[in-house]
From Swiss-Prot:
<dbReference type="Pfam" id="PF05697">
    <property type="entry name" value="Trigger_N"/>
</dbReference>
<dbReference type="GO" id="GO:0061077">
    <property type="term" value="P:chaperone-mediated protein folding"/>
</dbReference>
<dbReference type="InterPro" id="IPR036611">
    <property type="entry name" value="Trigger_fac_ribosome-bd_sf"/>
</dbReference>
<feature type="compositionally biased region" description="Low complexity">
    <location>
        <begin position="432"/>
        <end position="452"/>
    </location>
</feature>
<dbReference type="GO" id="GO:0051301">
    <property type="term" value="P:cell division"/>
</dbReference>
<comment type="similarity">
    <text>Belongs to the FKBP-type PPIase family. Tig subfamily.</text>
</comment>
<protein>
    <recommendedName>
        <fullName>Trigger factor</fullName>
        <ecNumber>5.2.1.8</ecNumber>
    </recommendedName>
</protein>
<dbReference type="InterPro" id="IPR005215">
    <property type="entry name" value="Trig_fac"/>
</dbReference>
<dbReference type="Pfam" id="PF00254">
    <property type="entry name" value="FKBP_C"/>
</dbReference>
<dbReference type="Pfam" id="PF05698">
    <property type="entry name" value="Trigger_C"/>
</dbReference>
<dbReference type="GO" id="GO:0044183">
    <property type="term" value="F:protein folding chaperone"/>
</dbReference>
<keyword id="KW-0143">Chaperone</keyword>
<feature type="domain" description="PPIase FKBP-type">
    <location>
        <begin position="164"/>
        <end position="249"/>
    </location>
</feature>
<dbReference type="InterPro" id="IPR001179">
    <property type="entry name" value="PPIase_FKBP_dom"/>
</dbReference>
<dbReference type="InterPro" id="IPR037041">
    <property type="entry name" value="Trigger_fac_C_sf"/>
</dbReference>
<keyword id="KW-0413">Isomerase</keyword>
<dbReference type="InterPro" id="IPR046357">
    <property type="entry name" value="PPIase_dom_sf"/>
</dbReference>
Length: 452
């Protein structure tokens, strides 16, 4: 095998590979030998089928597998000799026929990391906020646990219901006197004041006493997830069957034991531990970002288009996921995909720059991600999402996402190395935490059970 390489651009290479007839012959014969051990042909015992019969019966498959195997061997060999790591899938052009007695020439093109001088990344100074968890935060989680385990009891009187209470209602929507499909329910428990429903709907429910009916105009916002309702105003008819309030359980050791812990004190410790671990990770990530931002200010290089596109697709997928959890969609933003991509371009470029820098550090430091590490990561993802591990692994391989995952894991290792070699100075938190982090605290009770 001979090859010649050229740089098409600072981030793209082209390699022409020429194979001698002997290599083609050896690859075909090797594939036939593998077939001989596994295929069955009528009239022959398994493993005793002549090579000529096997080649005649399975010629197309054998030649294609032999061709691909030879290309894979060559690519691995060339990458090692060139000391490069493709960033995405390879474009392979094979104009020559693959057959006995002839050589085989083909071309591969692929993107690579740009070459640039790495800035000094060892011994950098960075500040990291200390972790502080106060009693108020712990109490907020305890209050939420009590609220989630509360009993619903009827309130005295006819109401109407107010914020903090739960109204059990029947409702149905009408437009021009006709029922609106899909907007109807019976014995629906609506917790008032918790933004579970449209403001107009909650306001209507708060005007109707227990046992009575009422109706009013309800306006659906323009970005409502159900496209057929977005922007419409309908007549909502409501009947209130019951008005209830929560009766909180006692905060005692029995409650703690129902959560898998010995006592209230152990429950508080588990909540504090959960907050501490979460906040430590957040503070560490903030310090790492500060280190990375400092390094990126010192370098300039061309960005590989495929890397930018990968970051763009990730950003769009993340945004779509966030909107879906809010009951919305990308279309609800009122922007075309072209406009969304334009808005996100600076962020995608910056993420790609960070990836290039970190992968370059990983290469210099000789860092690597093993197949076992990649497999473990995919397995953990399958466990979180409930997907079949084997199917998910095959999906990653078919789509080429396995290379994206490998590069991300490698970049993470490089970031961890830079952080480990930095001079980290702990400082007091700049400001008290807002309620945003507390929104994640329902998971704290689960973490509490896991930490027993």
């Amino acid at each position: 095998m001979e090859y010649s390489a050229e740089d098409i651009s600072p981030v793209r290479k082209k390699v022409v590979i020429t194979t001698e007839p002997q290599e083609v012959e050896a690859s075909i014969m090797g594939t036939i030998a593998l077939y001989k051990t596994s295929v069955q042909v009528d009239g022959f015992r398994k493993g005793k089928v002549p090579a000529s019969v096997i080649e005649q019966r399975f010629r197309d498959k054998i030649y294609e597998e032999a061709r691909q195997d030879l290309i894979n061997v060559h690519i691995n060999d060339v990458m090692q000799k060139l000391d490069v790591m493709p960033l995405a899938g390879l474009d392979v052009d094979t104009p020559d026929a693959f057959e006995r007695g002839k050589g085989f020439a083909y071309t591969i093109e692929f993107e690579v990391l740009p070459t640039f001088d790495l800035p000094p990344y060892e011994g950098m100074d960075v500040e990291q906020e200390k972790v502080v968890v106060d009693e108020k935060e712990v109490q907020e989680v305890l209050d939420r646990i009590l609220r989630d385990r509360a009993q619903l009891v009827p309130v005295e009187g006819k109401g109407p219901a107010v914020d903090g209470q739960i109204a059990t209602v029947d409702f149905a929507a009408f437009e021009n006197g006709e029922p609106v499909e899909g907007v109807k329910a019976e014995s629906f428990d609506l917790a008032l004041g918790e933004r579970q429903a449209l403001e107009d709907f909650e306001a209507l429910v708060k005007t109707i006493p227990y046992g009575e009916e009422g109706e009013g105009e309800i306006h659906f916002p323009e970005d409502f997830i159900a496209k057929d309702l977005a922007g419409k105003t309908v007549t909502m008819k409501v009947k209130v069957h019951a008005i209830k309030e929560r009766k909180l359980p006692a905060l005692d050791d029995e409650l703690a034991k129902s959560l898998g812990l010995e006592s209230v004190e152990k429950l508080k410790e588990a909540i504090t531990k959960s907050y501490t671990e979460s906040r430590t990770g957040l503070n560490r990530s903030a310090a790492q970002k500060s280190l990375l931002d400092g390094l990126l200010k010192m370098v300039a290089f061309e960005l590989p288009p495929s890397l930018v596109e990968t970051q763009m697709n990730t950003l769009l997928a993340d945004m779509a996921g966030r909107l879906e959890r809010q009951g919305r969609s990308l279309e609800s933003l009122g922007k075309s995909m072209e406009d969304l991509r334009k808005d996100m371009q600076p962020q995608a470029d910056e993420l790609a720059r960070a990836q290039v820098l970190l992968l370059s550090v990983a290469k210099k430091e000789g860092l690597d991600v093993t197949d076992h590490e990649v497999t473990t990561q995919i397995y953990q993802l399958a466990m979180r999402t409930g997907e079949d591990f084997k199917a998910l692994r095959e999906q990653y391989e078919r789509s080429g996402m396995i290379f994206v995952l490998r590069d991300r894991m490698l970049a993470d290792k490089a970031m961890d190395l830079i952080y480990a070699k930095a001079n980290v100075k702990e400082v007091e938190p700049k400001a008290p935490e807002t309620g945003a982090e507390a929104d994640a605290a329902p998971g704290a009770s689960a973490s509490a059970q896991e930490s027993k």
